[in-house]
Amino acid sequence: MPNTFFGMTIGASGLFASNAAINTTAHNISNINTKGYTRQSVSQEAGFAIRVYKPYGAVGTGVAMVDISQVRSQYYDERYRHNNAQCGQYENLQTYSELVQTYLDEFNTEGFIAEYNNLFKTIDALKSDPSSEVKRGQMLSHLSSVCNYFNTLSTNMQNTQNDINEEIKSSVSSINTMAEQIASLNKQINTIEASGGSANDLRDTRNLIVDQLSYYADVTVNEREIGNGVSDYTVTFNGQNIVTGYTYDTLQCVARETDKKRNASDVEGLYDIKWSNGNPYNPYEENGRGSLKALFDMRDGCNDSYEKVKTDANGNQSLEIVVDSYRNPSYKGIPYYQSQLNRFVTTLAKEFNDIITKGQLADGTMNTEK
């Protein structure tokens, strides 16, 4: 049986351990609204037993506090980052799809349907009285209005494509900054933990940055214990290592040359992305996720095809839609709507011109002008 003072020491160890647990609980409650904070827990184990050369061999010395560790699930980290990438993807697709919808404005009195209906109303009115200068003027006025509508719509589409292009550049800059921060935190965490300290707060910061990084693309993390409190922390971004221990890779935006446009209606200077080490970056992967993929889908997506301008022997130009699932993503982005718009306008203009060249003049003679 332990003596009085030894018993008090055992009791005191329990009080100290309980006090540490209470303080840690208070710390957890205080940080309940802290973004990125991970709940902490006091790890305890039985104190080192003392041999007393008795039949029972040894006596316990109370409880010892081993560590204050984070209570975090790797499985839920992976699921969160997977879903965060999907969230980033669909948020961007929704934002820009709704913007295109406002341009088309089909349910407004001044949208496409209204312009189309007004044009053919004036055509029907002119059919009943072809010689009327007033009705001719009204039809020409509505034709001009339709042309202005399509020109404005095309300009809005091009401006949106350019805005998406700039957002891609901004996203790449943010991704590079986060990669640099993670590499720096890896070094700080290893420095502290190699000397026996606890780097829970720095680990929280690192996990928060990785969570934010997962918004842009698929992210996976692998932490491998090396020994003596040092670990090798690797982050992959869209299938390629972006952080390996204390080093990191970056993405670069490279403007396309004019003769390398994906679509005839694309604005100048659209960016492609590559890794700084020279490896290609593919934002069009079918099973990819993330806000960065959504931006490329919306900027370049043309329903597995692309728009090509053909010129015949007489110098006349026409549009051709070429099916090529390897060139552009399947999503119906800005180029798709531009392509449909161009086809509609080209067809409408051709039909009008054909009718005019086959029509009669005011004096009843056939039109001979081409």
Q: Model regions: which residues?
A:
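Extracytoplasmic/periplasmic terminal helices and flexible tails
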Residues: N83-S174, E180, K187-N190, T365-M366
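Internal, well-ordered alpha-helical scaffold/interface segments
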Residues: E180-A183, T346
